């Protein structure tokens, strides 16, 4: 397969429509040749050799009409005025733009299997070779010469092992007869890995460039050529191992080496040797730059093979990651006070634990026999007009009684079996970052600083690495050691306590923590000790909660029942804290609060705030900031109205929906670096000054910037139905609020929102329109769908002061909205849409003006699909 193209154009070339000033002012010569050949076809077919070969070459020469330095002179006139052939050639090359490209590629060179022999791991068929070489030469007015070379050589090895299973109990049917032995009977072990792959690549990029010396007004100053080289060697191998049918393992190790064999006298960052090309030192694998190791484990927990737990499906996944990164060469030999230090490299690891569990409760109910019983039907009289038979009625009475009993029993079973499904997902992510690490990994991987650390373990390795002299001892080292921890819990359940009533429960909890510290390694002789400096912890927290007890209590700009409870709860919480810590409850300040636990102490405000807005008793609420168990929120939908004759007569469908979401969020918490623990065996006045803040309260070990409580009824209630005449009606009420408490200024911000929506929809079936778009029939028959929504939303923001009777509305607005749309399908692919949106906003504060927005128009939508 050979393709060739060529092009030539001269100055003044152009189309008839182009004027003289628009035509080309340069001569262009260009050709391009590309060849694709499978060289393996030239060899005997029985060898099975595949050698895909690709060669390409192109050149482009652009000669301008005018000289590039003297723009008002033609190039020909300058060449004629040249004093010598050397000067003439110099002027010509200075004006020309010349580019030459060459590429040689062998991609996918391999031997295919030509026999039915059993594959072996040492077969050459498992190997694939790749070679790619590209070269670009260029010169123009500014660049005297430039050469770019890119070389890539790779080898890939892949082999899939045939499974060798060990199943010792598979055929022992006489020994394992019961279902409870199934978990042991199904025991299996795969003795060989599933697959092994190995990839290696040599990548070399070379660039040489020299700028042209143009009109320097004297002899050339001898601008040096610029060199840029990027030589790397990449090596990676992967092992996939299905240890059992339920347990699989994946391990990948990857190395990235930097090759720097082009420096004179092997001095890194020194002078480069100009004579060396991409082929010199080709098999020099260089020094490690980056190394990573990844371990993945998936385990299908066989608990469902035990009959009692057959309703449980559980999966555990683990991933561990390790990465070593070379440090900067600039800090490899850093001098300070006559000593030379190495600031080292960085290592980091991470792991992830995922547990996904599903409980199919219907299987559990069937296993324990909690299923509804069929209702026996009473035999009716067979002959119309026949008088009742007293004996038969007497026989049917026990059946009717049993039928009522069965219905009652089934109703109870419906309630007991209302939980249909439970889903529990837990994930935990951990990571460690350690700078100043002096060790270098091996070629195929490393087990330092510990085997566990390289596979993702979060065991503390700081002190071990320091004792073994693996950390830098530079006294002014300021990179931080860091760890991260994230825990996520999601719980959901589906309930159906009665027919057509579906309830979805959801709960979640998220905890994120980041720990950082500076450190110093003190060297005393041959002993090294790790010293932690300025430890700091920060993070955030979020959990689903329940605020419905105060959702409908009075709360406006004049007063708030929950806020008044918040104020009153402070004293109760303060006395509890003082009592729990062994402080004197009767030793009070001017406001009547125990000393050290004042009315504006963070330790007092937080539980008092949570108790007030969640409707809990301040005498029983937890005084800590974090909660362990998420409280579920819910979505509810009832569609059982259509069972009743009146609804069935007047409606096609009728549903009632309700939803509730509420969360408790700590936006940021961090450790108090100024914290000092008080001695509660002493009275308040005898405490050390450093245990108290400026307000005289005991300092808190953890500081919070602000906490938020959010609540949404989405919707509070929604009625959605369609009448028999195809009129669709939707009525919806939404309610939400956001309460934020700032510990910086002890201000509470409350954002309230209420929205009312009424929607109408109607479909005119088979509306006929005369149009040429319909083809020969000249008539389009389609449905016209119309929809209108009217909404009113009120929201306002109120700032409340704890110690002042001065609530203020700082923002808010009332928004009226009207949306109307109509769509009509002119064909299978063409739809026309008319829309009209009207919005009017009236703000709650006098400094903002009312605003009206109207959007209307037509949309034509064409679907290019089938």
Predicted segments, located by residue:
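Exposed, low-structure sequence patches enriched in small/polar residues
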Residues: 1-866
């Amino acid at each position: 397969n050979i393709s060739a193209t060529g092009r030539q154009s001269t100055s003044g070339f152009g189309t008839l429509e182009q004027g003289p000033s628009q035509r080309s002012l340069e001569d262009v010569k260009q050709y391009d040749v590309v060849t694709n050949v499978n060289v393996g076809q030239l060899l005997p077919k029985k060898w099975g050799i595949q050698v895909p070969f690709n060669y390409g070459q192109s050149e482009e020469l652009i000669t301008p009409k005018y000289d590039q330095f003297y723009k008002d002179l033609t190039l020909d006139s300058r060449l004629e005025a040249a004093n010598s052939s050397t000067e003439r050639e110099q002027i010509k090359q200075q004006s020309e733009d010349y580019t030459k490209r060459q590429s040689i590629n062998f991609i996918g060179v391999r031997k295919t299997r030509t026999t039915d022999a059993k594959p072996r791991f040492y077969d050459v068929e498992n190997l694939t070779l790749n070679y790619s070489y590209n070269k670009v030469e260029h010169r123009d007015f500014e660049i005297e010469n430039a050469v770019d070379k890119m070389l890539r050589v790779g080898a890939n090895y892949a082999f899939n092992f045939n499974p060798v299973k060990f199943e010792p109990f598979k055929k022992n049917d006489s020994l394992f007869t019961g279902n409870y032995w199934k978990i042991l009977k199904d025991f299996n072990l795969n003795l060989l890995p599933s697959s092994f792959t190995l990839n290696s690549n040599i990548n070399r990029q070379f660039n040489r460039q020299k700028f042209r010396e143009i009109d320097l007004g004297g002899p050339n100053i001898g601008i040096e050529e610029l060199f840029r080289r990027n030589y790397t060697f990449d090596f990676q191998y992967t092992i996939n191992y299905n240890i059992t049918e339920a347990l699989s393992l994946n391990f990948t190790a990857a190395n990235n080496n930097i090759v720097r064999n082009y420096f004179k006298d092997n001095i890194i960052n020194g002078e480069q040797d100009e004579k060396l090309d991409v082929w010199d030192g080709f098999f020099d694998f260089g020094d490690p730059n980056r190394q990573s190791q990844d371990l993945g484990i998936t385990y299908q927990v066989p608990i469902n093979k035990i009959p009692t737990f057959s309703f449980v499906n559980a999966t555990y996944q683990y991933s561990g990651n390790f990465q070593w990164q070379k440090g900067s060469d600039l800090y490899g030999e850093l001098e300070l006070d006559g000593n030379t230090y190495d600031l080292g490299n960085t290592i980091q690891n991470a792991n992830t634990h995922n547990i996904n569990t599903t409980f199919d409760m219907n299987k559990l109910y069937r296993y324990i026999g909690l299923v509804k019983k069929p209702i026996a039907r009473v035999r009716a009289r067979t002959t119309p007009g026949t008088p009742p038979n007293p004996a038969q009625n007497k026989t049917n009475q026990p059946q009717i009684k049993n039928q009522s009993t069965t219905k009652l029993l089934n109703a109870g079973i419906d309630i007991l079996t209302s939980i249909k499904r439970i889903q529990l997902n837990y994930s935990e992510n951990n990571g460690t970052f350690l700078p100043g690490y002096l060790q270098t990994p091996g070629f195929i991987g490393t087990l330092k600083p510990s085997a566990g650390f390289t596979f993702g373990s979060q065991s503390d390795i700081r002190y071990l690495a320091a004792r073994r002299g693996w950390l830098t001892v530079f006294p002014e080292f300021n990179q931080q050691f860091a760890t991260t921890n994230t825990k996520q819990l999601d719980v959901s359940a589906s309930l159906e306590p009665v027919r057509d009533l579906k309830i979805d429960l959801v709960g979640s909890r998220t905890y994120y923590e980041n720990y950082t510290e500076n450190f110093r390694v003190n060297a005393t002789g041959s002993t090294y000790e790790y010293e932690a400096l300025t430890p700091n912890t920060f993070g955030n927290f979020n959990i689903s909660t329940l605020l419905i007890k105060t959702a409908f209590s009075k709360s406006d700009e004049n007063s708030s029942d929950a806020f008044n409870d918040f104020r009153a709860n402070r004293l109760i919480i303060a006395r509890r804290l003082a009592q729990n810590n062994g402080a004197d409850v009767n030793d009070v300040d001017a406001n009547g609060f125990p000393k050290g636990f004042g009315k504006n102490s963070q330790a007092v405000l937080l539980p008092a705030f949570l108790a007030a807005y969640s409707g809990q008793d301040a005498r029983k609420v937890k005084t800590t900031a974090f909660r362990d168990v998420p409280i579920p929120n819910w979505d509810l939908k009832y569609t059982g109205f259509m069972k009743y004759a009146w609804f069935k007569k007047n409606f096609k469908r009728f549903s009632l929906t309700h939803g509730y979401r509420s969360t408790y969020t700590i936006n940021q918490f961090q450790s108090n670096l100024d914290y000092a623990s008080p001695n509660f065996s002493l009275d308040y006045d005898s405490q050390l000054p450093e245990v108290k803040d400026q307000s005289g309260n005991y300092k808190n070990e953890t500081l919070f910037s602000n906490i938020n409580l959010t609540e949404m009824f989405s919707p509070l209630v929604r009625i959605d139905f369609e009448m028999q005449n195809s009129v669709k009606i939707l009525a919806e009420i939404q309610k939400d609020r956001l309460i934020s408490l700032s510990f910086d200024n002890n201000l509470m911000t409350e954002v309230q929102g209420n929205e009312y929506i009424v929607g109408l929809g109607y479909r005119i079936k088979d509306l006929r329109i005369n149009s040429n778009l319909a083809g020969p029939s000249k008539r389009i028959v389609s449905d016209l769908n119309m929809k209108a929504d009217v909404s009113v939303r009120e929201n306002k923001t109120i700032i409340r002061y704890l110690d002042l009777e001065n609530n203020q509305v700082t923002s808010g607005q009332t928004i009226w909205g009207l949306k109307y749309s109509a769509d009509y399908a002119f064909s299978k692919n063409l739809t026309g849409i008319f829309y009209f949106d009207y919005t009017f906003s009236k703000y709650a504060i006098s400094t903002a003006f009312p605003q009206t927005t109207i959007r209307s128009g037509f949309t034509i939508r064409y679907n290019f699909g089938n």
